Amino acid sequence: ENRALEVTYLYGASGTGKTRGIFEKHDRKSICRITDYGGRNGVRFDAYHCQDVLVLEEFHSQIPISAMLNYLDIYPLTLPARYTDRTACYTKVYITSNIPLEEQYRDIQRYQMETWRAFLRRVQNVIEYLPDGSTVQHKKGGFPCDTK
């Protein structure tokens, strides 16, 4: 069965409250934080146990774009883990970073424009965390090659 998936990109300087905001919005037990990008396809889902919220922390294009497109897709998916792969059950994904969305996957933007567009289509919300603790919701279409 397909999942209704909401993907939110949060960015801003360290200490501005990106992760704190996620934990204030969701029950801790429903959150899986991914912080290790050393596995096959750039990530290991060893800590994932069907949580509803997936957080990709400190993201800087570590996951190959082909894998990332699958992780952010609505279709049924098996996630790579060390001993036993996991079934994706999450319906919310947060990608946190210190850099704006348009600075991710620079080579993909340059040489694989359709792939970059596919990535942008999967991101519904872009929120910037400012040093004063406030946030700015950016409109879709505010990024290069994003026409929506």
Model-predicted segments: where are they?
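Short, surface-exposed beta-edge/turn micro-motifs
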Residues: 5, 51, 90-92
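Structural motif
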Residues: 9, 53-55, 94
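Conserved alpha-helical scaffold flanking the Walker A/P-loop in AAA+ ATPase domains
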Residues: 35-54, 62, 66-67, 80-85
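Catalytic glutamate of the conserved HExxH
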Residues: 58
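P-loop NTPase catalytic core of nucleic-acid-dependent motor ATPases
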Residues: 1-44, 49, 127-128
